[in-house]
Each structure stands twice: as C-alpha cells, then as structure tokens.
C-alpha cells in the first residue's frame, strides 16, 4: 500500500500494522523527529523496518526560516522545514533502533535536478497549464521561474565540493 499525504494527518486503525515503512524526502519537512518516529513505530509490527531517504548536510543542521524576501527556498519550498545533518537521526532511537546508515554523494542528486530542469524546459507547453491550474494563471510565469531556480539551486548545492557538502542519506531502522 502506498500512502501519499501530510504525515501530521495520517492515522491508521490500531489493528493495522506494517512490516515495512518507506519515507522518501519527507523528514526534511518535519521538525520533531522523536514524535514522528514514535508515531511511525506505532504503525509497525515488532521487527518491522523503516527506510528513510532524506537530503542532509554532511555536518550541520539548520532550519528553513523566512526572514525576508531573499529566503525564497524557505518561503516556497521548505516552509517550516529543516536541513538535517547526516548524523541527526542517530540521536532519535527511543522507539526504533538504527540498524544501518549510509549516504550517496550529492552529485547523484545534482544530475537528477539537472535532468528534471531539462525535462521541464522540454515540456514547457504542456506544463504551463498545469502550473496555472496549481498556482493561478496570474502566478504561472512566476512559479515557472521558481521551479527552474529551485532545480538549478539544488543542482549547484548538491554538486558543490564534488557532492560532499550536501548529500542524500539513507537510514534503516528496526522496531524492537
């Protein structure tokens, strides 16, 4: 079963438990990892596993805060979010135990972002109506530019220092 929603609103009947849970690019939008992992653990059977795929900084954790108009990434894409450090999830093992942790250098996500940008540009005519529907026709061009800049920014960030500064981190947790 694949569930796509705001995890804050997600709830399962207490009788429904899972053996595997996968989270892809969701933890960056959350702040209270202890609470989040406790909720996820409550949905899991004993010995079940959680796989987390998340963007991280190799060393530092920082929040996405909107302080002024220059903070467009925080305002439009990661409102209230956080860029965790690669080791941050190591500190939240009350409900789930970390079994393994590895990372993929950022150049892979650089290439992904560049491919998404190229695909977006190649399909502009078919995407503009979708963007207009999502953001309103008056804002469509603005959001077209925001998305282009987003992909360019991600490509530059994740390619920086040979992909060793911002990375993709993977974690495997198990419920005792």
Task: Walk through the language-model features, giving the residues of each.
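Conserved SAM-binding strand-loop segment of SAM-dependent methyltransferases
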Residues: 1-9
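Phosphate/diphosphate-binding loops
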Residues: 6-7, 24-25, 36
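Substrate-binding/catalytic lobe of Class I Rossmann-like enzymes that use SAM or dcSAM, i.e.
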Residues: 56, 62-168, 174-176
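Short conserved AdoMet
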Residues: 31, 45, 93
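A short acidic, Gly/Pro-enriched loop at the edge of an enzyme's catalytic core
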Residues: 8-21
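A short SAM/SAH-binding and catalytic strip from SAM-dependent methyltransferases
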Residues: 19-32
């Amino acid at each position: 079963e694949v569930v796509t929603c705001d995890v804050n609103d997600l709830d399962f009947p207490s009788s429904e438990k899972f053996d595997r849970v996968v989270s892809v690019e969701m933890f960056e939008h959350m702040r209270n990892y202890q609470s989040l992992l406790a909720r996820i653990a409550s949905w899991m059977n004993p010995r079940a596993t959680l796989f987390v795929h998340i963007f991280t900084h190799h060393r530092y954790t920082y929040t996405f805060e909107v302080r002024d108009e220059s903070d467009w990434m925080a305002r439009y894409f990661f409102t209230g979010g956080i860029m965790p450090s690669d080791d941050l999830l190591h500190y939240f093992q009350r409900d789930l135990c970390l079994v393994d942790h590895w990372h993929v250098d950022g150049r892979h996500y650089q290439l992904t972002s560049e491919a998404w940008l190229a695909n977006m540009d190649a399909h502009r005519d078919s995407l503009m109506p979708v963007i207009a529907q999502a953001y309103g026709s008056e804002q469509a061009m603005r959001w077209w530019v925001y998305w282009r800049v987003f992909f360019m920014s991600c490509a530059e960030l994740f390619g920086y220092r040979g992909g060793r500064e911002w990375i993709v981190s993977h974690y495997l947790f198990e419920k005792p």
